[in-house]
Amino acid sequence: MATITAHVSLAPVARRAPAAAAPCAPLLHPAGAQVILGATDDALGMAAPVVPSAKSMFGPRGVCAAADGSFWVSDTGHHRVLGWRRLPEADGTPADILLGQPPFDREGRNAGGNANEDTMNVPTGIAVCGRDGAGLAVADAWNHRVLIWHRRPTQSYQRPDVVVGQSDFDGGQSNRGHSQPDAGTLFWPYCVAWDGERLWVADTGNRRVLMWNGLPQINGQPADLIIGQD
């Protein structure tokens, strides 16, 4: 059965110092897309088989660019994150860094096994984070957790430093298997954001937003603020 090949489009922009509350460089350009990632030819945007590789994507849902020039994509359908050390300047530039799967040609929820510090299950939101803008946060939605690197990965398979939403990296149940949520649990977190001082997570399945003052430092750290529920 044919699937839809997804593209991520971006435009080169002049480098400039980022604002403290928004460390990502802008991606959009008024002239339209200048670079296409996810396929070598824009014509492949129609039905085509999606085979995992350093160039392909399947249903990417999150993207961010850091002030150091690195570029990151949540390749949601392949259950992985792709990273480029520098903002790509040519169509079809292969990714340099792979997170969530063993090699580039493999895919599957939690790499075909259970949740751990090396796997992902429907990663969606992604954001540069940390007061110095050096970190990375990924909303690993169907593992009901957010993965945090205090320093962005510089090589493939680099493990996250902290997980929130679960008590450890081996947990993968919604609300940690409890019948009710609390300040330390998540259920389908689909979006994550950093405002320069606080981490925000859209806890979609629990119909609320959670906030942490500063970047969480320990696994399972509870949120400091809950919006949307009592």
Model regions and ranges:
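Intrinsic N-terminal pre-sequences and regulatory tails
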Residues: 1-26, 52-54, 59, 65, ...
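Gly/Pro-rich loop segments of beta-rich domains
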Residues: 18-59, 87-124, 152-188, 215-230
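Structural WD40 beta-propeller signal
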Residues: 66, 129-131, 195
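Conserved beta-propeller blade signature
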Residues: 70-73, 135-138, 198-201
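Short loop/turn segments immediately following the C-termini of beta-strands
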Residues: 76-77, 86, 131, 141-142, ...
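Structural signal for beta-propeller blades
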Residues: 79-81, 144-146, 208-209
